[in-house]
């Protein structure tokens, strides 16, 4: 389908004939033909989405059969959230790459909901993301590592360092948070609502990596994994603030489809991270 979509002029005649037959069998128009080429219709896009997932699994199976079990070649497709990558997965990837340099690592940056959807669609082997992560059978979730988040502010908030702020009091200061479509926003929105306060950030960041620079620029207070803020706090670039309430711990977790067969490389990497808990 993608070959035909990209073809131009009178080339790829046989592919076009095959697609014409498919359109007749389905009774659907899959392509809109113009002088400059062809484009997928809505029906064509829907068909392609299913074919793509099936082809991905077929190609993975072919790779596994060709490479055997020696782990000298192969590939792993991993969906990972930015926080999980920074505070957990990087060390595991480095160790695996040193042990199996012939394995091709495909790392996809996703939010937790996006990564879970990719596992469900069979587009990736598994996901390493942060909680909360909503999964339904046949997907499964394994907790890998807990972590805590802290409240930080720029140096202009140094006067608050000796105080204990409540969730309600935080509302009086500008807030920085990840976007509303993320599980991190939902996590803190639930906490704020439990204390009778609405989470209404003044600045919404696209990724966790953006939060620390925004705090340093004095745009507001923010919650961030302690490991990611440690150096900045130590160097007094930002201020760690105390909360009256204890925040729940969060977790880095592995999400996989128990019905989706993994190639030998993916099996080995999954085994390593699960056994290292």
Indicate residue ranges for each PLM-predicted region.
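Alpha-helical linker/hinge and terminal dimerization helices associated
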Residues: 25-26, 47-69
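Central regulatory/effector-binding core of bacterial HTH transcription factors
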Residues: 73-135, 205
């Amino acid at each position: 389908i993608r070959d035909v979509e990209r073809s131009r002029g009178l080339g790829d005649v046989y592919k076009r004939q095959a697609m014409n037959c498919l359109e007749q069998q389905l009774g659907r128009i899959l392509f809109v033909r113009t002088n400059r080429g062809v484009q997928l219709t809505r029906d064509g896009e829907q068909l392609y989405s299913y074919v793509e997932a099936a082809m991905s699994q077929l190609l993975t199976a072919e790779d596994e059969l060709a490479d055997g079990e020696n782990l000298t070649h192969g590939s792993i497709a991993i969906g990972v959230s930015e926080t999980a990558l920074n505070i957990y997965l990087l060390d595991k990837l480095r160790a695996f790459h040193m042990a199996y340099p012939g394995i091709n690592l495909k790392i996809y940056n996703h939010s937790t909901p996006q990564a879970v959807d990719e596992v469900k669609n069979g587009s990736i082997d598994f996901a390493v993301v942060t909680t909360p992560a909503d999964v339904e059978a046949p997907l499964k979730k394994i907790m890998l590592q807990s972590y805590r988040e802290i409240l930080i502010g720029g140096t202009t908030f140094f006067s608050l360092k000796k105080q204990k702020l409540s969730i309600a009091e935080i509302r009086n200061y500008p807030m920085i948070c990840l976007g509303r479509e993320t599980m991190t926003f939902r996590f803190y929105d639930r906490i704020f609502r439990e204390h009778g306060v609405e989470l209404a950030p003044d600045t919404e960041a696209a990724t966790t990596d953006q939060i620390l620079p925004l705090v340093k620029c004095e745009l507001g207070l923010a919650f961030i994994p302690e490991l990611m803020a440690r150096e900045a706090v130590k160097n007094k670039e930002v201020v760690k603030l105390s909360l009256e309430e204890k925040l729940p711990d969060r977790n880095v977790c592995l999400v996989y489809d128990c019905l989706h067969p993994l190639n030998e490389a993916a099996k080995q990497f999954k085994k390593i991270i699960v056994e290292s808990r």
